């Protein structure tokens, strides 16, 4: 496992590369999600494969975490990793770090019961628990800097354009 010095060296090299040629850091990420039995999906992204499902109370079999768990995990893990990256870059030691992601919801929107209720979260917040020998000012600077450059935090806080493209393949009649 790389230590903070190794992480800083790698990140400094990446920063230099994208500073010299922005195109090095630009691209499009593609994740494929396939429907499986019932309310289960299989996610495929490069070498990674994992399942997503729904609980029994929504008609699933509770065989995998639901999309909300992965969404909250995406934000929380992005924050934890970002704090680690910026700690290495700024030289701020972290002895322990946990991020809790809280999301308020009303399932009436998602289930189409009430059109005035949003199908997504009504509010989100995160709580950072951090232990460090650094001063409170240094830790606050670290957290503020990492939050400013957190990609998932940014995706959630601003409206990212989202479009849908559909390809319909009709089954041959027998």
Where are the regions that the model predicts?
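Extended beta-strand/beta-hairpin segments
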Residues: 1-72, 83-174
């Amino acid at each position: 496992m790389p230590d903070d010095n190794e992480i800083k060296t790698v990140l400094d090299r990446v920063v230099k590369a994208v500073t010299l040629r922005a195109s090095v850091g630009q691209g499009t990420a593609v994740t494929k999600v396939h429907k499986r039995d019932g309310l289960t999906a299989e996610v495929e992204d490069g070498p990674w494969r994992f399942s997503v499902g729904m609980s029994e109370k929504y008609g699933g079999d509770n065989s995998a975490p639901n999309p909300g768990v992965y969404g909250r995990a995406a934000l929380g893990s992005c924050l934890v990793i970002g704090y680690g990256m910026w700690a290495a870059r700024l030289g701020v030691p972290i002895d322990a770090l946990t991020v809790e992601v809280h999301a308020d919801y009303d399932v009436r929107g998602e289930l189409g019961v009430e059109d005035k209720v949003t199908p997504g979260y009504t509010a989100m917040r995160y709580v950072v628990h951090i232990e460090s020998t650094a001063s409170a000012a240094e830790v606050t600077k670290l957290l503020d800097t990492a939050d400013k450059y957190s990609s998932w935090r940014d995706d959630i806080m601003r409206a990212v354009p989202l479009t849908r493209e559909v390809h319909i393949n009709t089954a041959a009649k027998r």
